[in-house]
Amino acid sequence: VTLTSTLALMATSLMAEQIKVGVSPGEHAEIMEEVARVAEPMGLEIDVIEFSDYVVPNQALADGDIEANSFQHVPYLEAQMKDRGFALAVVGNTITTPMGVYSDKITDIANLEEGATFGIPNDPTNGGRALLVLQQLGMIKVDPEAGLVPTVLDIIENPKDLSFKELDAAQLPRSLADLDAALINTNYAIASGLSPKEDSIAMESADNPYVNVIAVQKGNEDAPWVKTLLEAYHSDEIKAFIDESYHGTVI
């Protein structure tokens, strides 16, 4: 029986499809590593490739250096495809990670002083998202004509005269000492040792349009490995891993 099992495993390994999946640090990387473990017995070997920013994973996918990526929400992907001409496609949803407000100086956003400086991501989609979170929290009001991608120029009400410093999203956790507060994506918060549940002073509503997705090159949507990847990601094992690991900060 042991020999038979060993031979079966060897045969499965030889037949396994191999793909590279690009992720960003934090929960996207951690979850995909677990997905890789679940997918292996299903005949899919996943090499998880971690990228340090939000730009390279789509470029790598468009160039064919990886087969899929899992790090972004639909508004960001759509903006990237429009701005850079990438021919990519969404094949499935993954997680939602509400953006948080973090500060080394205050513990309650109501105590934010007039003229305070907020750090926000410098890419249009996540920068716009950050401004919409501040609007949700009653700190500012933006022009509704701007939709999901307002800029600081679209702020029409700013009663506390807040100023904004636009930085690369990955740099925001390291820049908290130089800011009064910052809007930080959950993956970069977790990667820097911040707990969204314990360390944030305010959180984006979970009811938001920023569900994250798995993207592939256009034309690969029906590749057999895509179905296996999605089955592994949406398995009960991964759901349990997310619930146990993130305690409601990743949905």
Model-derived regions, located:
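Pocket-flanking alpha-helical
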Residues: 54-85, 100-102, 107, 127, ...
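Periplasmic-binding protein-like
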Residues: 93-102, 190-234, 251
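Beta->alpha turn/N-cap motifs
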Residues: 26, 50-54, 64, 69-78, ...
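Short helix-initiation/N-cap motifs at beta->coil->alpha
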Residues: 48-59, 146-174
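A conserved helix-loop-strand patch within extracytoplasmic ligand-binding domains
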Residues: 91-141, 239
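Ligand-binding clefts/hinges and TM-proximal coupling segments of bilobed small-molecule sensing domains
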Residues: 124-140, 144-150, 230-251
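Short, well-ordered beta-strand elements
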Residues: 17-26, 44-50, 117-118
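Ligand-binding "clamshell"
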Residues: 79-91, 104-106, 178, 183, ...
